[in-house]
Amino acid sequence: MKQGGSDAAKQAAGESAAEAVEDATVVGLGTGSTAAYAIRAIGQAVDAGLDVVGVPTSFQSRQLARDCGIPLADLDDVSVDLAIDGADEVASGNLIKGGGAAHAREKIVDASADRFLVVADPTKEAAVLSYPVPVEVLPMARSTVVTAVEELGGDPTLRRAERKDGPVVTDNGNLVLDCDFNSIHDPAALASDLAALPGVVEHGLFVGMADEIHVGTADGVTVRTLSK
């Protein structure tokens, strides 16, 4: 598992992406420590008079947005102009997400946005995706999905909770399998294979979705614009 980068790098990336938020827009609010800096920066802009509405991707981001005074809406009621979200790993513009077990809701919101900005620190960059892919599964399908993932060449592990007995349970009431495929040279093919498995709610491969990558360092931010 990758260790997280410095708080300064995360803050730089989050605040850089938040600067892209314009007045009278709807913003998808991502999950994780780097996205949290973007949410706080948006909250400060709201305090200064910026007119935005947020669509949170998790219980965590909803609570933080409320604390920051950002008005919220459900995806059923608005269209998302811009989404800002973090990543567990970034390679060639593709992502692995789901370290916070919120990747199903994140993918729905991020995919619906007109523009999707990824915020990360340098420790999340890689030449090839290799981070274990989180796969959210229906509880009754855990065993069958484990077998299917193994047939695809993966090594699935049920994610255990750290502060309670038993497994992690997602905001949707499901379980998470962390599936190690070693180096993923064809993320699009693997994404298609995982999505086709009965019982899989969503996987953490975000392929061809990002429009910009904001990578923060202690000295500044590098912004890469991607072509789709």
Swiss-Prot record:
Binding site for substrate: 31-34, 85-88, 97-100, 124
Classification via HAMAP family: Rib_5P_isom_A
Origin species: Haloarcula marismortui (strain ATCC 43049 / DSM 3752 / JCM 8966 / VKM B-1809) (Halobacterium marismortui)
Disulfide bridge partners, by residue number: none
GO biological process, one term: D-ribose metabolic process
Protein name in UniProt: Ribose-5-phosphate isomerase A
EC number annotated for this UniProt entry: 5.3.1.6
Catalysed reactions, as listed in the record: aldehydo-D-ribose 5-phosphate = D-ribulose 5-phosphate
Residues forming the catalytic site: 106
Signal peptide region: none
Keyword terms, alphabetized: Isomerase
GO terms assigned for molecular function: ribose-5-phosphate isomerase activity
One GO cellular component term: cytosol
Lineage, top ranks: Archaea, Methanobacteriati, Methanobacteriota, Stenosarchaea group, Halobacteria
The family this protein is said to belong to: Belongs to the ribose 5-phosphate isomerase family.
Pathway(s) it belongs to: Carbohydrate degradation; pentose phosphate pathway; D-ribose 5-phosphate from D-ribulose 5-phosphate (non-oxidative stage): step 1/1
Subunit structure: Homodimer.
Function of the protein: Catalyzes the reversible conversion of ribose-5-phosphate to ribulose 5-phosphate.
Gene3D superfamilies xref list: 3.30.70.260, 3.40.50.1360
